[in-house]
Amino acid sequence: MQCLGAEHLDSAERIPTQRQWRPQIYRKCTDTAWLFLFFLFWTGLVFIMGYSVAAGATGRLLFGYDSFGNVCGKKNSPVEGAPLSGQDMTQKKHVFFMNSCNLEVKDVRLSSTVLCVSSCPEEQLDTLEEVQLFANTSGSFLCVYNLNSFNYTQIPNADLLCPRLPVPPSKSFPLFNRCIPQTPECYSLFASVLINDVDSLHRILSGIMSGRDTVLGLCILAFALSLAMMFTFRFITTLLVHIFIALIVLGLLFVCSVLWWLYYDYTNDLSIELDTERENMKCLLGFAIVSTVITAVLLILIYVLRKRIKLTVELLQVTNKAISSSPFLLFQPLWTFAILIFFWVLWVAVLLSLGTAGAAQVVEGGQVEYKPLSGIRYMWWYHLIGLIWTSEFILACQQMAVAGTVVTCYFNRNKSDPPDRPILSSLSILFCYHQGTVVKGSFLITVVRIPRAVLMYVYNTLKEKDGALSRCVSQCCCCCFWCLDKCLRHLNQNAYTTTAINGTDFCTSAKDALKLLSKNSSHFTSVNCFGDFIIFLGKVLVVCFTVFGGLMAFNYHRVLQVWAVPLLLVAFFAYLVAHSFLSVFETVLDALFLCFAVDLETNDGSSEKPYFMDQEFLNFVKRINKLNTRAQRNKNSLTSEEGTELRPL
């Protein structure tokens, strides 16, 4: 690949024995082979997108279809060999089951004939005469399409071409516009087949779509809370930190209490009949246990680290001073989040198209079935890897851009005259020279996350069996991969900052950063960890308030929903939004301390080699060193006292 800018050897690479550690003016492209590999991978993704558009039929999934291959609410093309296909269903938007009270699933296929109708019968129809009257008055024909309403009561085999009597009253369901019977006996049987025996994807979509307004409102709430939290960290004081920690403690305890109360309410509800409601109850128990454990761990950590609050406030104020030199850094997550949303919507659309890609086959009675095309399962895995890798690449680009901005501002001698447009300068360096480095770092995260996903699937599969040893092994492996993921993310962030300084490739940058930080870790490790912990608590606060709103909202929508899945989706989205906004502080903090380590490595504070850090940052570091020295002295004195032998006078 040809670089988009001038290609020169860095001064740091001319002297391999000693790194110069200065922002380079002349750079070269790094990790170009990885960028080419990413380009080839995306060529495959574009092919899958084109294939899904050509072979998929998302309308069948979103709007529903009848037994003859017609999508309800659409104008359809005929299927060869199916005389009742290819009809105009523009006015017939509802899916009606002719035998809704006796549904069965045979070979992953409903036993009842399905039709598209213009409206669902809201009153019970006991005879064919009433079915005929309903068709004439409402224009909704409940018998097969080739039977005229006049013949409903005339031909002898009309009962085989019309719905089984009596036809129960029904209402349209939000997802697929299905006509759902309202009588208790039919409702239980219908729901147990339609929801409990349908595949997981449709059940999850059912819960999300039926509560889509609530999900959207909660996502907006999470967005607003994340903005508020970001500005809270921007103008943080000691009082705000104490209020913030108090809100965290109250929020955690409150959410735990509400979860246990809802679980108790479900266990004493005698009207629960559906498996989906029982799944909601199990999910509530799981949420309650997990939230209780997380609350206990966080409360212990808050108690242990309470003495570091004042230093943490000073640390965040130093971070805010670095951000004030380039205040548009706070808006960096907005465009990153917008790009992620666009990519996720595109990914879901392609996934839905892949899920509906199938060849129409005519079976007995002129009905139509859709058989999945070969190769779809491999495309699905490829598509999933594309989701993880591309999402990590977008987030890594933000990390590199923020780190480059911090580096530019930190290594500026004249603090009163900040550099012009540091964010645009950092972005231009990223896209011209270091995209390959970002691709390589995001690929390492992807390699770790895919086995985690597979192990989680294996663990969930083994939960229903008696393999206790297998479950334990898979869970331990998941924990190991989680720890590896966290370590890699921290290593990647420092590697991106080093690349922004020296212009070196990913492996060289990671090695240099690790070596430099290990030499200077005593200066800032503890306070940096607590700063990251406070930022993490900010994310937890956003999730707590959003989940509480979701619990109150979804608790009133128990009918025909797996509402535990939308609640989990809302919690994940809330954490993701909070992470997108607050990660700017984490990135600035990590980049700032790496620049500080570089400053200590290359300068000594003399007139010949003055520090790049300002006086406020230097005073903060001195206070940390004094506290660390005092703590070490106290520890040594306690050790010596314990080892002293008491002798008689």
UniProtKB/Swiss-Prot annotation:
Keyword hit for Repeat = no
Span of the secretion signal?
Answer: none
Q: Does the keyword Lipid biosynthesis apply?
A: no
GO MF terms listed in the record are: organic cation transmembrane transporter activity; transmembrane transporter activity
Sequence intervals crossing the membrane? 33-53, 213-233, 235-255, 284-304, 334-354, 384-404, 533-553, 562-582
Q: What is this protein called?
A: Choline transporter-like protein 3
Family of this protein: Belongs to the CTL (choline transporter-like) family.
Gene Ontology biological process terms from the UniProt entry: transmembrane transport
List glycan-bearing residues.
N136, N151, N414, N502, N520
Pfam families to which the protein is assigned, alphabetical: Choline_transpo (PF04515)
Species whose genome carries this gene: Bos taurus (Bovine)
GO CC term (a single one): membrane
